[in-house]
Curated annotation (Swiss-Prot):
One of its GO terms (molecular function) is 2-methylisocitrate dehydratase activity. Keywords: 4Fe-4S, Iron, Iron-sulfur, Lyase, Metal-binding, RNA-binding, Tricarboxylic acid cycle. Involved in the catabolism of short chain fatty acids (SCFA) via the tricarboxylic acid (TCA)(acetyl degradation route) and probably via the 2-methylcitrate cycle I (propionate degradation route). Catalyzes the reversible isomerization of citrate to isocitrate via cis-aconitate. The apo form of AcnA functions as a RNA-binding regulatory protein. Could catalyze the hydration of 2-methyl-cis-aconitate to yield (2R,3S)-2-methylisocitrate. It is an enzyme of class 4 (lyase). The gene is acn. This is Aconitate hydratase A. It comes from Mycobacterium avium. Pathway: Carbohydrate metabolism; tricarboxylic acid cycle; isocitrate from oxaloacetate: step 2/2; Organic acid metabolism; propanoate degradation. Its EC number is 4.2.1.3, 4.2.1.99. Its cofactor is [4Fe-4S] cluster. Monomer. Binds 1 [4Fe-4S] cluster per subunit. [4Fe-4S] cluster binds at C499, C565, C568. Belongs to the aconitase/IPM isomerase family.
Length: 961
């Protein structure tokens, strides 16, 4: 069949890099231009080609976010996957309609973090070898959309509270991750248009401070900057007016290789902002309030767009924080339009004058500049008066569960009974002398070893003020930390962490000013609190240093532990051994306070049950308090005149931050990003291959060459019907991608663990499936291996088990072992599912592992959209039971032999609407039905005919010469 699509594989320039010539992948195709939208705009002395939105009637009525999508379709119209009808559909968008019209979105660039990015790069490296095996040039495999990978997920706060914590944590980081880092260092030199930012930054902070352009320019064409990323918090860039969100690895790879991302035109929730921020340092409080409002309203799968006169009152850093939290309240994106604040931020962060001028001119020319007086039509409406926002935290297990700080003590007392055992008493002071209550006010100094004051009481206690709540005081003795009493509600982690807040100078300086004021009063953190500081950019370190604030933070124990995600993603590191033992031996329900974005149970630290996102100043305050019961209305201390100082006074004093040390000096950013891709000496010292294909190590348990292209011919073979297939899994409703491909711990005794044991995994241990995503051998064995998965082929058996019908009687077996036996006998596999199959995160290995097990088809009642697309991207056909029917309704129990006919219609250039399924079982009549083929677009049909999206792209690269 003749492929109707224009494939973006042209190269217009070559450059020598490291002694090797590399072709620069550049999009050189042109739009069909059905609306005559192609035009030019002049900015200074330069002229740019643009695609005018006003050439399409009704686009002026659209919300900002949909205007960006409309331009994307207009510029990428190819007459097949993106047609005039698609453009008109978005131009004539009905705000009240549901999300039902599918479009193909072509992001301008891709951003990745190392945890999810490694398997994507493994695929690209494998493609290079495959194209060489087929007689092509390996260097043809290069991103066609610019891609950046930032290493931020690997650093762990193992060491803390000391001046050398950062250096020691970096050393441990390289010991743990040397194998992966060597692979990424090779990538840095081997690919064009793909850059790697070595450790010491967080991807989303780098994105807003450096990578994002707001308006892109490629080959003389100017267009809105858009992106997809392999991390859900990619939405942080929405604060700059850049439309972007998190996707799975398969979609990210497709986008890098010039393929569009399938999506539905969404509903758009207009969020009107009025009033002024209550204080410059209140960004986190605003974010938690917006998160609460959106989660209660219901914004899942929708765009949230901020508008109104209050938008101008929201600083760009605060906008970025709001965008960052989009996944927490469920929206696909949470975007601000472009305005003067955007321009000022671009200047502030050191973007060049030519780029800034292009952004302003383009936005105004295209109707993308925010007009506070104009109210676009939205699907739904929300509103917030910023002046009504109050200091807040959230928790203990969901970021949308906001708690006003004034109510934190009472709410905690309501929550704690559900987190403690039945044996814990309600009268906490029955075990302590009542006088303790007066002995330990909130401003008590702490122990000296972890940034604590020198004058400490005999025994400090987290059980003080425990009256009226469950209490289980436990005395802890430590050579380093002294003697103290732990109890339920003790704050054992206080972490200034995450790009969510560390990208915001006002809240970061607010935390440091609070530290300075408390240290000057002789106050200190409690000895049981693990205090860590992990910013997302070295800019933070530099302005702290310039302002002379580091000594005060360090006096409270907030030493630099690393630049990276750390505590926010669960890399909090272990608690001191004595504290961890006391918690676990006595089943204490302790807490963490962090300036991060997620607080799900078990996420932050295995010893901590209750987690509370808060602003950086509140993190410092809770480190001083040491317990969740101390901050309601008690003073943090007294000023020089002997007056009580309350937390609210600290917050209001931040109005002086208008001229904070960072000022308006863009040199902070130009200096720190001048060598952003160079890395520190440890990075540069990594042994790095110089070949254009990767030198795979046969001993590696982290990075291995996957088998996707083994035996692949230059031309696709005809697709075939499925005969004599067996069911490897019969599943119920709401099976998530985490059920299919877990990211958590590798359970001893399972096929994945056995493989690693046989491979002599080394001192790192089994670790997590998430750490091993670059090794297909581990990930195949982990597919359908979630310990909570219930395969209905068995009664009352959970985990990665099935029945192996290659053996007499179909005995119980691990799914991986049974799949190997089926493969040995050339028996294809199918999976039967219920409603919402593949829901949850867009995890690429849920589709990759399914295909590599030998599954040819998944038949379900309904699919989550991204997973359905990912299955096709891996050559697995998604089929849907007849409307209203389920496997149970059709009498299927998973013991049948399946024949699926009609798939071969795809060889004739058309996609069948249904295929015929016959399920035969000995001793009974066959069940027969017509299943709906969920290949929904011409592009998906092309991918399936080729055996997957990577095979499709590879073959087109070969054809392009």
């Amino acid at each position: 069949m003749q492929d109707k699509r224009t494939v973006k594989v042209g190269t217009v320039a070559d450059t020598a890099v490291g002694g090797r010539t590399k072709s620069l992948g550049v999009e050189v195709t042109d739009s069909v231009n059905s609306f005559g939208a192609r035009n030019r705009v002049k900015v200074g002395d330069k002229s740019y080609q643009i695609y005018r939105l006003d050439a399409v009637p009704n686009t002026e009525k659209l919300p900002y976010s949909l205007k960006v999508l409309a331009e994307n379709l207009l510029r990428n119209e190819d007459g097949s996957n993106i047609t005039k009808d698609h453009i008109e559909a978005i131009a004539n968008w009905d705000p009240k309609a549901g999300a039902s019209i599918e479009i193909q979105y072509t992001p301008a660039r891709v951003v990745m973090q190392d945890f999810t990015g490694v398997p994507c790069i493994v695929d690209l490296a494998t493609m290079r070898e495959a194209i060489a095996d087929l007689g092509g040039n390996p260097e043809k495999v290069n991103p066609l959309a610019p891609a950046d990978l930032v290493i931020d997920h690997s650093v762990i706060a193992d060491l803390f509270g000391t001046a050398d914590a950062f250096e020691r944590n970096v050393e441990i980081e390289y010991q743990r991750n040397g194998e992966r880092y060597q692979f990424l260092r090779w990538l840095q030199g081997a690919f064009s248009d793909f850059k790697v930012v070595p450790p010491r930054r967080i991807v989303h902070q780098v994105n807003i401070e450096y990578l994002a352009r707001v308006v892109m320019e490629r080959v003389g064409v100017a267009y809105p900057d858009t992106c997809v990323g392999t991390d859900s918090h990619t939405t942080m860039v929405n604060g700059l007016g850049v439309l972007g969100w998190g996707v799975g690895g398969i979609e990210a790879e497709a986008a890098m290789l010039g393929q569009p991302v399938s999506m539905l035109i969404p509903r758009v929730v207009g969020f009107k902002l009025t009033g002024e921020d209550p204080a410059p340092g209140a960004a986190t409080d605003v974010v938690l309030t917006v998160t609460e409002i959106c989660a209660k309203h219901g914004v899942v799968g929708k765009f949230v767009e901020f508008y109104g006169e209050g938008v101008a009152e929201v600083p760009l850093a605060n906008r970025a924080t709001l965008g960052n939290m989009s996944p927490e309240f469920g929206s696909t994106a949470a975007i601000f339009p472009i305005d003067q604040e955007t321009i000022d931020y671009l200047k502030f962060t050191g973007r060049n004058a030519e780029q800034v001028a292009l952004v302003e001119t383009y936005a105004k020319e295209q109707g993308l500049w925010h007009d506070p007086a104009h109210e676009p039509a939205f699907s739904e409406y929300l509103e917030l008066d910023l002046s009504q926002v109050v200091p807040s935290i959230a928790g203990p297990k969901r970021p949308q569960d906001r708690i006003a700080l004034s109510q934190a003590k009472s709410v905690f007392r309501e929550q704690i009974p559900s987190y403690v055992g039945d044996g814990d008493g309600q009268q906490g002071y029955s075990k302590l002398d009542e006088v303790v209550d007066e002995t330990f006010p909130a401003s008590d100094p702490g122990a000296p070893s972890n940034g604590h004051a020198d004058d400490l009481p005999a025994v400090q206690s987290a059980a003080a003020h425990a009256n009226g709540r469950p209490s289980n005081p436990v005395t802890v003795r430590s050579d380093e930390l002294g003697e103290f009493v732990l109890d339920h509600g003790a704050v054992v982690i206080a972490a200034v962490t995450s790009c969510t807040n560390t990208s915001n100078p006002e809240v970061m300086l607010g935390a440091a000013l609070l530290a300075r004021q408390r240290v000057e009063k002789g106050l200190a953190s409690k000895p049981w609190v693990k205090t860590t500081m992990a910013p997302g950019s070295q800019v933070v370190h530099d302005y702290y240093d310039k302002a002379g604030l580091w000594p005060y933070l360090e006096k409270l124990g907030f030493y630099l532990v690393g630049y990276g995600c750390t505590t926010c993603i669960g890399n909090s590191g272990p608690l001191p051994e004595e504290i961890s033992k006391a918690i676990n031996d006595n089943d204490l329900s302790v807490t963490a306070v962090l300036s991060g974005n997620r607080n799900f149970e078990g996420r932050i630290n295995p010893d901590v049950k209750m987690n509370y996102p808060a602003s950086p100043p509140l993190v410092v305050a809770y480190a001083l308090a040491g317990t969740m019961t101390r901050l309601e209305k008690q003073p943090l201390g007294k000023d020089k005149d002997g007056n009580d100082v309350y937390l609210k006074d600290i917050c209001r004093s931040q109005k002086t931050l208008g001229h904070h040390p960072i000022g308006d000096n863009s040199e902070w950013f130009t200096k720190n990003y001048a060598d952003v891709f160079k890395g520190e000496q440890a990075w540069r010292n990594l042994p790095t291959p110089t070949r254009n294909t990767f030198e795979w190590s046969p001993d590696s348990t982290y990075v291995r060459k996957p088998p996707y292209f083994e035996g692949m011919p230059a031309e696709p073979e005809p697709v075939a019907d499925i005969s004599s297939a067996r069911v490897v899994a019969l599943l119920g409703d709401s099976v998530t991608t985490d059920h299919i491909s877990p990211a958590g711990s590798i359970k001893p005794g399972t096929p994945a663990a056995q493989y690693l044991d046989d491979a002599r995994r080394g001192p790192q241990g089994l670790q997590l499936f998430g750490c091993r995503r670059g090794n297909h051998e581990v990930m195949i064995r982990g597919t359908f291996a979630n310990i909570r998965l219930r395969n209905l082929l068995h009664d009352d058996v959970a985990g990665g088990y099935t029945r192996d019908f290659t053996q007499d009687g179909g005995p119980q077996a691990f799914i991986y072992d049974a799949a190997q036996n089926y493969a040995a006998q050339n028996i294809p596999l199918v999976v039967l599912g219920g409603k919402e199959y593949g829901s949850g995160s867009s995890r690429d290995w849920a589709a990759k592992g399914t295909r590599l097990l030998g599954v040819r088809a998944v038949i379900a009642e309904s699919f989550e959209r991204i997973h359905r697309s990912n299955l096709i991207g891996m050559g697995v056909i998604p089929l849907q039971f007849p409307d209203g029917k389920s496997a149970k309704d059709l009498g299927l129990d998973g013991t049948e032999v399946f024949d699926i006919t009609g798939i071969e219609e795809l060889n004739k250039g058309k996609t069948p609407k249904t295929v015929h399924v016959k399920a035969s079982k000995n001793g009974s009549d066959a069940a027969e039905f017509d299943a709906v083929v969920r290949i929904d677009t011409p592009g998906e049909a092309d991918y399936y005919r080729n055996g997957g999206i990577l095979q499709y792209v590879l073959r087109n690269m070969l054809k392009s010469g």
